């Protein structure tokens, strides 16, 4: 292991051990805020420390075993050689793992995620495909034991949605879905096509970390214009006879959000505010990343010219253009897209390793 990596890991371990001692101090133990802060910090580095400790134990095993190589007893020498070989192999794998674990983490990876899908170029077919993508993500959420909850939608007359917004709750939901952001292109023969021609349409997908802490995004009430309207269910059927749906306009930014899937106006107001805060937070993240040069190459901006993925129905092929990865479209639309997600994360890790010179 290189000296730079070893020193970094040693420093993290020392920080962890120091924090563990602090947690036992009465002044920390009795201070919930401080105790929570230190515990959270240690939880974020515990996996690194656990694996580095295994590495150190193996190093000591190798050191002790090398002393036994000078023994005259052949069985003892053979045992020592096996221990050295076994420990060296384990440390090779541990080093690979530690190189990834030590990489900078996205501060939002642990959050839930809010996703907005909009039909873009292609009219009716784009809206229908927006509905197909919603079904795909819903199936993915079920497979991965996550919960998908509709927040808002605008039904399209021909089926599907011109816009649909939903929340995905679960372990590291944002981390797993953050690279879905961008333009998704579909190539297929629409049901209304009489001559069998393949049409190309696009939908835009925007992925935002859910903001669940009020203090993270401060909104002045005077900056909000709030309207109510009658909600309708997915597909256009009326589900409410009162104006329970809520639309909020953030006047300084011009952002407009709405929620209509909750049963009461109060709940829809809370959901709409959550979407608004997540949009404002996402804008701040992008601005900060652009200023510091940390904009992720794999995270699409949502610009119409930026096509991140193509869904080719005639050829049963889905291709992610950022990494040149292709797989079965039929399987992917059943929510089985973890192979794509994992390939994107592998590319992200490779980029970070290159940037960190590890």
From Swiss-Prot:
InterPro entries: PCRF, Pep_chain_release_fac_I, Pep_chain_release_fac_I_sf, Prokaryotic/Mito_RF, RF-1. Belongs to the prokaryotic/mitochondrial release factor family. Methylated by PrmC. Methylation increases the termination efficiency of RF1. The keyword Nucleotidyltransferase does not apply. SUPFAM superfamilies: Release factor. The modification N5-methylglutamine is found at residue 237. Pfam families: PCRF, RF-1. Signal peptide: none annotated. One of its GO terms (cellular component) is cytoplasm. Peptide chain release factor 1 directs the termination of translation in response to the peptide chain termination codons UAG and UAA. It comes from the Bacteria. It is found in: Cytoplasm. This is Peptide chain release factor 1. GO terms for molecular function: translation release factor activity, codon specific. Its main location: cytoplasm. Keywords: Cytoplasm, Methylation, Protein biosynthesis.
């Amino acid at each position: 292991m290189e000296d730079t990596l070893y020193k970094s890991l040693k420093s993290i371990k020392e920080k962890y051990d120091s924090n563990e001692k602090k947690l036992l101090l009465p002044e920390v133990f009795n201070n919930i805020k401080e105790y929570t802060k230190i515990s959270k910090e240690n939880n974020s580095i515990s996996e690194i420390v656990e694996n580095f400790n295994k590495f150190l134990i193996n190093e000591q095993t190798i050191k002790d075993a090398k002393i036994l190589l000078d023994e005259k007893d052949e069985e003892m020498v053979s045992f020592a050689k096996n221990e050295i070989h076994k420990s060296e192999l384990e440390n090779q794998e541990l080093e690979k793992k530690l190189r990834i674990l030590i990489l900078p983490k996205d501060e939002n990876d642990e959050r839930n995620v809010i996703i907005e899908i909009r039909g873009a170029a292609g009219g009716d077919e784009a809206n229908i495909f927006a509905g197909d993508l919603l079904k795909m993500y819903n199936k993915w959420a079920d497979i991965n034991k996550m919960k998908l909850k509709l927040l808002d939608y605008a039904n399209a007359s021909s089926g599907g949605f011109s816009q649909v917004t939903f929340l995905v709750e679960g372990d590291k939901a944002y981390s797993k879905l953050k690279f879905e952001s961008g333009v998704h292109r579909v190539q297929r023969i629409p049901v209304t096509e009489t001559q069998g021609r393949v049409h190309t349409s696009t939908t835009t997908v925007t992925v935002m970390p859910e903001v669940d802490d009020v203090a993270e995004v401060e909104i002045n009430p005077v900056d909000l214009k709030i309207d109510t309207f009658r909600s309708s269910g997915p597909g256009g059927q009326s589900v409410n006879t009162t104006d329970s749906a809520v639309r909020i306009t953030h006047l300084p930014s011009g952002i407009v959000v709405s929620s209509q899937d909750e049963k009461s106006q109060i709940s829809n107001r809370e959901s709409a505010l959550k979407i608004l805060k997540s949009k404002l937070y996402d804008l701040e993240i992008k601005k900060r990343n652009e200023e510091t040069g940390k904009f992720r190459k794999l995270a699409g901006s949502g610009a119409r010219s930026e096509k991140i993925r193509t869904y080719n129905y005639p050829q049963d092929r889905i291709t992610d253009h950022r990494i040149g990865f292709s797989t079965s479209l039929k399987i992917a639309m059943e929510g089985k897209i973890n192979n794509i997600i994992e390939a994107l994360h592998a590319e992200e890790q490779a980029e970070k390793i290159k940037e960190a010179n590890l």
